[in-house]
Regions:
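Active-site loop segments of alpha/beta catalytic cores
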Residues: 1-226
C-alpha cells in the first residue's frame, strides 16, 4: 500500500462475545428475550467464547499494522445505552488499551443511530470512529458527532450516501448540504471524509468528483501535533 493508505487488519464485528451473540449468532428478537430471561446462561456462553476473543486480540497485537479494526454497528435502540455500557464498552476499552500499549490505534465501525451513545463513546478509548453517518440518515449532524466523540477521536465518514443519489437528493440540495458540511469543519483536524456506510451502485459518480473539488478548495489539513 505504501503512502497510498493503510492496510488495516480486522478483528470481530461483535466487539465482545455478548455483542457477537446479538450481532451474528442468533436472531435479534430471540437475543432480546434470552437477555431478559436467560441472561446468566448468555454470560456463561460469553465466558466460553472469551479465549477465542483473546486469541484474535493477541494476533492483531502481534502484527505490524499501525491501525487495527475491532467491533461494529452500534445503535442506541439495538445496543441501548445500559447494554452498551455493560456489555460492549469494557471490551472496547480493553482492546483500546492493548492497542495503545502496542503502539497501535484502534478503529471501530460507528455507523447507526447513536445519539444516546455519544456520551459513552469517549470512555471506550477508540481512536477512530469509522463510517460515521450523519443526518439525514441518522438524527445527528456531523458537528454533533464530532462534539460527542471528543477532541481526541478522529471521525471517519461524514457524507451520507443518500446525498450522492439523484433520485433521493436533488442537485441543489446536494450542493447546499456539502457547502454546510465544509463550513462546519473548522480546521478539519481529526476528520477523514468518506461516504457512509458505502457507495451504492446508483450514486451519481459526478457528485463524487464534485466532493473532490470541495476538498481541494478547503485546502490541506495540518495534523494535530504536527
Amino acid at each position: 500500500v505504501g503512502e497510498r493508505g493503510l492496510a488495516i487488519p480486522n478483528g470481530p464485528l461483535g466487539a465482545t462475545p455478548m455483542h457477537a451473540m446479538l450481532h451474528d449468532l442468533m436472531a435479534m428478537q430471540d437475543f432480546f428475550v434470552y437477555y431478559v430471561e436467560e441472561r446468566q446462561a448468555l454470560k456463561e456462553l460469553a465466558q466460553r467464547m472469551a479465549p477465542f476473543y483473546d486469541a484474535m486480540l493477541d494476533a492483531l497485537m502481534a502484527c505490524s499494522a499501525e491501525v487495527v479494526f475491532w467491533g461494529a454497528n452500534y445503535d442506541h435502540d439495538t445496543t441501548w445505552p445500559p447494554f452498551f455500557e455493560e456489555e460492549i464498552l469494557p471490551g472496547l476499552r480493553r482492546v483500546a488499551d492493548r492497542s495503545h500499549d502496542a503502539g497501535k490505534l484502534l478503529m471501530t465501525h460507528t455507523d447507526g443511530e447513536s445519539r444516546h451513545l455519544l456520551d459513552l463513546f469517549p470512555r471506550c478509548g477508540f481512536d477512530v470512529g469509522e463510517s460515521v453517518c450523519p443526518s439525514p440518515m441518522t438524527s445527528c449532524t456531523l458537528r454533533e458527532f464530532r462534539q460527542g466523540f471528543g477532541p481526541s477521536t478522529t471521525v471517519f465518514g461524514g457524507i451520507p450516501c443518500v446525498v450522492l443519489i439523484d433520485a433521493v437528493t436533488p442537485q441543489a440540495d446536494f450542493e447546499a448540504y456539502m457547502d454546510e458540511l465544509f463550513s462546519e469543519l473548522g480546521s478539519g483536524a481529526r476528520v477523514i471524509l468518506g461516504v457512509s456506510d458505502n457507495v451504492p451502485p446508483e450514486v451519481n459518480l459526478d457528485r463524487l468528483e464534485q466532493v473532490k473539488c470541495w476538498v481541494d478548495a478547503f485546502g490541506p489539513v495540518v495534523a494535530p501535533g504536527a
